[in-house]
Amino acid sequence: MTNRLVLSGTVCRTPLRKVSPSGIPHCQFVLEHRSVQEEAGFHRQAWCQMPVIISGHENQAITHSITVGSAVTVQGFISCHKAKNGLSKMVLHAEQIDLIDSGD
């Protein structure tokens, strides 16, 4: 089964960095996406806020470059996590994050 998602947007919440009891670093943030997409010949506004998590020592360098307002493209897979309130939420598990150059 295929499970791939590529989403570009802006980091809209301060990244939360933690280390698991087994020593694996994790970085969580929320990505806000806004765009215009074409559907059935019509333009429509597309908008979402997607929780993102990236894990592992090999990703530490990029996670320390991410701040609120950073424009990024995230590639990975989606999975459901159960929130503290008992509700399920979809989360993008990042395998690659690229900073988007603002052109400044």
Swiss-Prot record:
Superkingdom of origin organism: Bacteria
Molecular function via GO: single-stranded DNA binding
Keyword DNA-binding among UniProt keywords: yes
Pfam families tied to this protein: SSB_1
GO biological process terms on file: DNA replication, synthesis of primer
Gene3D superfamilies in UniProt: Nucleic acid-binding proteins
Keywords: DNA replication, DNA-binding, Primosome
Family membership: Belongs to the PriB family.
UniProt function note: Involved in the restart of stalled replication forks, which reloads the replicative helicase on sites other than the origin of replication; the PriA-PriB pathway is the major replication restart pathway. During primosome assembly it facilitates complex formation between PriA and DnaT on DNA; stabilizes PriA on DNA. Stimulates the DNA unwinding activity of PriA helicase.
Self-association state and partner proteins as the record states: Homodimer. Interacts with PriA and DnaT. Component of the replication restart primosome. Primosome assembly occurs via a 'hand-off' mechanism. PriA binds to replication forks, subsequently PriB then DnaT bind; DnaT then displaces ssDNA to generate the helicase loading substrate.
UniProt-recorded name of the protein: Replication restart protein PriB
